[in-house]
Structures are given as structure tokens and as C-alpha cells.
Amino acid sequence: MPVDDTLIAFASRLADTSGAVIRPLFRQRIDVAHKQGRHDFDPVTEADKGAERAIRDLLRRERPDDAILGEEYGAQAGTSGYRWILDPVDGTRAFITGRHEWGSLIALEKDGAPVLGLLDQPVLGERFIGVNGAAHLIQAGRSQKLEVRACASLSEAVLCATDPRAYFTNEQVAAVDRVARGVKMTRYGGD
């Protein structure tokens, strides 16, 4: 289902709203709490919670019939068939250590099918949007279409991912390692 320009612009407004909350907190002394019952250490900060609250407030005002699923505050039902999925600070460990490997994730579903994905890196001024079968990097007001590199074989591939040792079982790590041995280059990082 094609997504119209109004929804694309609104998703960008949600990212702007999130970034306005998060940017002043990056590389500042902020409290870090632990979300109980998730992982050994699953940090959450006021940046995570404040940004999600700000996004939810904007959604309630302008799209009150849409459902919401957020990392920090869970699910809110809707009646429009649209559902916004939010993780305002994906990579909280990187965020609290002052590294740039984090971003705000905003996705939109229509009747259970994904129709838009947005990654905003507000301190770097980079925004990635995937919608209507295309992906773009928006930076300094300019849009650049993104495409995957041509890759005829696994030995030409570059594998970039979160460090599998952070979340995977030993069996899953071994599977990733088998793939990694066959690629041209591997880069792990972030959380």
C-alpha cells in the first residue's frame, strides 16, 4: 500500500519531536535505570522515556485513532488500522557511553503490514526513510536515494551488525561466525 506524502512528513515530524528531547541529553550526566526482567542489564534513561512521551503526545493530538506500540510505554489501541512502532533511543548503551551508534526508530504499519520505516540520528543530522519500495538518506535538507551494492557472491559481501555476543545464544553466535568467515569484511558494534 503506497504511503502518501502527508504520512511521510508526519513521520519526520515525530522524529523531529523525538530529537528535540534527546539532543540536549546526549553526553550529559543523566540517570540510568534498569528495566527489570529483560536482560542482565537493559538500561533506560529520561531520553528514552521523555522522547517517547513527546511522540505519543503528538500522535494523540494529531492522529488519535492510530494505535501505538512503544519500547518504554507499551501498546495503546487504535481504530484507524494504522499502528506506530516507536523506539526513541535504539542503542541506549551507546547513548549513555557517548557513542554515536544509536538512533530513533519509528515505523508505521497499516492493517498489520509494514509501510514505512524511519531511522533518525539527531546528533549526526542523518535521517533514513524507507517507504513505497525505496530508501533515502536525508541530510542537510537533501535527499539521496539509497541502494544496496551489487554483490555476486558471499565472498564480496560486507557484514555489519550488532555484536551477536550481546544477545544471541552460543549456537546462534556460532552460526553468525560461520557466515562471517565467508564474507569480505565484518564490522560489529553498538547494542
Residue ranges of model-derived segments:
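Glycine-centered loop/turn positions within well-structured domains
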Residues: 20, 66, 102, 125-126, ...
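N-terminal subdomain of lithium-sensitive/metallo-dependent phosphomonoesterases centered on the IMPase/IPPase/PAP
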Residues: 1-89, 174
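Residue-level signal for inorganic ion chemistry
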Residues: 22, 48, 59, 92, ...
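Acidic beta-strand-loop-alpha-helix segment within the catalytic core
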Residues: 107-191
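Short, well-ordered turn and helix-capping elements at secondary-structure junctions
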Residues: 72-74, 89-92, 163, 183
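Glycine-rich active-site/cofactor-binding loop and its immediate structural neighborhood
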Residues: 82-122
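Flexible, active-site-adjacent loop/turn segments at secondary-structure boundaries
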Residues: 28-30, 42, 93-94, 100, ...
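Conserved protein kinase catalytic core
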Residues: 77, 93-96, 127
